[in-house]
């Protein structure tokens, strides 16, 4: 039988009770005695805290979005690194980028302690191996051109600290996300995002408010960076990969809404453009064939708005 604790030093660990995420929430001290109605109401009320915590971190989020965008525009990649819930949230956000923005699967990557198997089966003990964070990044070819977002709700995860330290060491962009004040747990990074959601209703269960705030922050980082990279026109995902019926319908509606293209003509354009909404729009608006539209888009750094303007069209 495998010893799950063979890699752990079983001497008494540091007391983490001072960490904000480990403290007891006075609102829920009688949690097990509440009625179902009171339980649900309490959770709904407490889940207002993540939004407030994320709003308080707007300056750091702006800084992070701009820095990530600069790196991606220069050929770098974005990596999320975490263990447990934090790592799973990073994997989730990374996995959504290709279908939403037609980005290369390598552009945004989620790195989870324990690998893909840890998505379904908890491997939280692996977070205690500091060298593993660096090793996992190295195995993916992480370089000085890339960005790392290290996610550690309590700010003490050795796996994440090791990865962030390595990113700083090689002059990559190192961004930290945690849910405790900096004086409680410092992290090696250039941009430090603190989402202070407070003690959890279920003491120490950071999959709750801390996880919600983290998901919100990751949504902001990836989506805003993709907007800055020109993968959005207005509020439409014009780089959507039309890979199923739902997404094909969305692509057709985008063509109709932006250029008044009916569905039959839209289907023809999407077939000719190999499913690219941007190319289809340029074909229709500028009277180009697919090859010329693709060439124009490349010349304009994949920015649809400037490509349209260059052929005298001002779709808004």
Swiss-Prot record:
GO BP: amino sugar catabolic process; N-acetylmuramic acid catabolic process; peptidoglycan turnover
EC number(s) reported in the record: 4.2.1.126
Pfam families per the UniProt record, alphabetical: GKRP_SIS_N
Reactions that this protein is recorded to catalyse: N-acetyl-D-muramate 6-phosphate + H2O = N-acetyl-D-glucosamine 6-phosphate + (R)-lactate
The SIS domain, residue ranges: 68-231
Record keyword Lyase present: yes
Keywords recorded for this protein, A-Z: Carbohydrate metabolism, Lyase
Broadest EC class assigned to this enzyme: lyase
GO molecular function, one term: ether hydrolase activity
Annotated active site: 96, 127
Pathway(s) per entry: Amino-sugar metabolism; N-acetylmuramate degradation
Superkingdom: Bacteria
Ribonucleoprotein in keyword set: no
Disulfide bonds: none
Family: Belongs to the GCKR-like family. MurNAc-6-P etherase subfamily.
Function (record text): Specifically catalyzes the cleavage of the D-lactyl ether substituent of MurNAc 6-phosphate, producing GlcNAc 6-phosphate and D-lactate.
Oligomer and partners: Homodimer.
Misc note: A lyase-type mechanism (elimination/hydration) is suggested for the cleavage of the lactyl ether bond of MurNAc 6-phosphate, with the formation of an alpha,beta-unsaturated aldehyde intermediate with (E)-stereochemistry, followed by the syn addition of water to give product.
PANTHER family, alphabetized: GLUCOKINASE REGULATORY PROTEIN
Listed name of the protein: N-acetylmuramic acid 6-phosphate etherase
Organism: Prochlorococcus marinus (strain MIT 9303)
């Amino acid at each position: 039988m495998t010893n799950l604790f063979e890699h752990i030093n079983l001497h008494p660990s540091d007391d983490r009770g001072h960490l904000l995420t480990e403290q007891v929430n006075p609102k829920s001290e009688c949690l097990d005695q509440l009625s179902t109605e009171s339980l649900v109401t309490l959770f709904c009320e407490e889940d207002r805290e993540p939004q407030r915590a994320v709003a308080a971190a707007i300056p750091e989020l702006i800084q992070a979005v701009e820095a990530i965008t600069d790196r991606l525009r220069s050929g770098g990649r974005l990596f999320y690194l975490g263990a447990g819930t934090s790592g799973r949230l990073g994997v989730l956000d990374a996995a959504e980028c290709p279908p939403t923005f037609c980005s290369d699967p390598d552009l945004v990557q989620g790195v989870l302690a324990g690998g893909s198997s840890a998505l379904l089966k908890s491997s939280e003990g692996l977070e205690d191996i500091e060298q593993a964070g660096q090793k996992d990044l190295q195995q993916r070819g992480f370089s000085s051109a890339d960005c790392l977002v290290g996610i550690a709700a309590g700010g003490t995860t050795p796996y994440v600290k090791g990865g962030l330290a390595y990113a700083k060491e090689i002059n990559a962009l190192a961004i930290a996300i945690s849910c405790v004040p900096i004086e409680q747990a410092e992290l090696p990074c250039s941009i430090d995002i603190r989402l202070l959601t407070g003690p959890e209703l279920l003491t120490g269960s950071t999959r709750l408010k801390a996880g919600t705030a983290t998901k919100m922050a990751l949504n902001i980082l990836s989506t805003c960076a993709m907007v800055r990279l020109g993968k959005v026109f207005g509020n439409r995902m014009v780089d959507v990969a039309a890979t199923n019926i739902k997404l094909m319908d969305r692509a057709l509606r985008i063509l109709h809404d932006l250029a008044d293209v009916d569905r039959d003509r839209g289907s023809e354009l999407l077939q000719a453009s190999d499913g690219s909404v941007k190319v289809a729009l340029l074909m229709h608006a500028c009277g180009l064939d697919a090859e010329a539209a693709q060439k124009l888009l490349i010349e304009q750094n994949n920015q649809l708005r400037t490509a349209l303007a260059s052929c005298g069209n001002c779709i808004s």
